[in-house]
């Protein structure tokens, strides 16, 4: 008797699904452990930096030189970072070197210790994908490479950020626009939930700010939400466009990576210290907290964080883009909320999820981020804003290797 096929495209049977689900438990524990270590050390280093800002940030050029040396000496294919993950997912490459794990972890810690404006989530996605892909050779499954990458990406995202449903849909939709890998939904969800639970049990805390007051949707409110979606979509587009442009232009102007990071980070250091004494260093969680808690947000906070993050990453420093995107969106939302007469915490949350969605070309993941971080009371506004943000962005993405499903 043949086992029933779940998907013609994936060629998965129920037996495959059970096997993958059992593996997902092991994967979730491993990646959750790695995420907990990575995340807790990063938080500790960031707090240490904030207490010794004027001693550490001036050493950013030296940290940059060390990062470039480590990548030049040891990286090989791993230097492609998320680009390599996407290439493997599209069967354009067949290996993710395990050395990516210590390399991207240590260099991201260095970037944050010395004040670079960068994120962490992209690193966690790489860590999860690398761990999971290492096991794919032991499983005789059709399209095993993509399946295991997807599960690992979800575990990495979910373990660090502890939004397992959002992490699941991020991994399912990000590799190819317009295509959801639904046949592997269950094992991907299991991997993400187990990783999230593991990292939480190991002391990694989740950021959440529940907004209990729900917004009543009428025509006027709908139009305001549509305008917000377009504004946040443009901000996400701007980040993705400038990041791609800056990497090309800086590399063209300063082709030697050592000169590039040394000269560029001297300028970056001055900017980080001059502009409100380190306000834009690190992840941007300070801006997120100020935005949702009603603190002081300046009109240009979002733009300065955007530009300094682009500059940091274009020089060769390591770290993800996602948490700065959250900060950019939240601070822009805090600025726009009074203009439209809407609650600041809610609009900050809408910006938080939709600038991320626009920059990554994802639709479902940001909506679930809204639900898991800010609560389900405003799920409809999340969806409306995200729909309009997604409307104006179908090709620009922080992930240059992302593909689009061709319409038949």
Model regions and ranges:
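Alpha-helical transmembrane segments and immediately membrane-proximal extracytoplasmic
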Residues: 1-408
